[in-house]
């Protein structure tokens, strides 16, 4: 028979007492009062923070947006079909954040930074808050480096700098997304990280953009954040902030980033839906009163950082759709007032075959020539002036039949300059190619050609300079100045190519 040893028992009891961990776990909980339309009303959750994540019994996550005296209004990040009245909810003590890392490059993710491209999990050791404050005044420096889009009309006349916010605005089907994707393609080899945020788009449109980027090798330096039109309003509202958090991760690591929001007016509609369901008072066009703040806090995160912070940058290109050219609607005017300029795309120009359909007259960049290299400044000034004079003359010439020779020549020159601004989609030009194209047009070398021949001649001239006069591109890229030597090389090339072209024709 086993003997009971009192000292052993007392030792065991003593050990257990010493190991006893008096950890008290306080959980902030509540009860679901009602649920529906992506909104839940919760009783309890007394100490919840505004914007805090809450977790429902069946696993759905929500964000506490309305903190009222009797209940808490929560927006759901999912369909919430399994949430029942009376089920419990607990506060997590966390604000919405996402994992961030280099591994996101080349991937398609949703607003919660979960991959949706079927290529497995993305591993990351760091995270960032989805909503983080924009850099302050001391943390910034003025924009001075160009961000080349590869489109002559933009780089010459409406230049965009690294750290700028430039709005792309126009009616549907005028090529807004094409301008943005061409800009992404043109960043190849420029060490710029691109983030494309698709908000409330058709899934087929997003797939088209992703395929176009993959075919041309641009996905290597691009992240696509997509929330399609059938996504919950909460996720459409969060998607742009997720994209901004990813771009900021690279910006604070001394990298240059480009972020495209396509389009913030869909985000505003999702936010309006959430606000109305939460019974917040509606304002103009039924948008809530803080819809301006919705976009300003997003776009202010784009910046050119000071040298103390490493001079990283985040350039934002929001895309806003207008209804039959009306830029005085609520969301367009809001975004115009926040951004540093706008590129206006016109349906009339698009239908007239001028593509990209940029209306140079009413488009503007508030950074201006600070975002251009010296070589571009040398040739672009004349182009702007001549096109402005041509637009004026063309309007006047409609009412007059007999024009003097000088006016006819000016009109002919203007038509050829307009022709040289046309570009095919997904064929961005280098700075050197743009400079030689503009120089050829503004110095009258195209005047002897028929309008239909202009684009063909310019294509052949660019190929000729690339193969026969490679020194031209070397001079422009190394000195950033359109030197006399470069000018002499270009004049020779134009003359030689002109002779070859006339023989072929």
From Swiss-Prot:
Keywords: ATP synthesis, ATP-binding, CF(1), Chloroplast, Hydrogen ion transport, Ion transport, Membrane, Nucleotide-binding, Plastid, Thylakoid, Translocase, Transport. It is found in: Plastid, Chloroplast thylakoid membrane. PROSITE patterns: ATPASE_ALPHA_BETA (PS00152). ATP binds at residues 170-177. Its main location: plastid. It is an enzyme of class 7 (translocase). It catalyses: ATP + H2O + 4 H(+)(in) = ADP + phosphate + 5 H(+)(out). Disulfide bonds: none annotated. The record marks 363 as: Required for activity. F-type ATPases have 2 components, CF(1) - the catalytic core - and CF(0) - the membrane proton channel. CF(1) has five subunits: alpha(3), beta(3), gamma(1), delta(1), epsilon(1). CF(0) has four main subunits: a, b, b' and c. Produces ATP from ADP in the presence of a proton gradient across the membrane. The alpha chain is a regulatory subunit. HAMAP family: ATP_synth_alpha_bact. Belongs to the ATPase alpha/beta chains family. This is ATP synthase subunit alpha, chloroplastic. It comes from Oenothera biennis (German evening primrose).
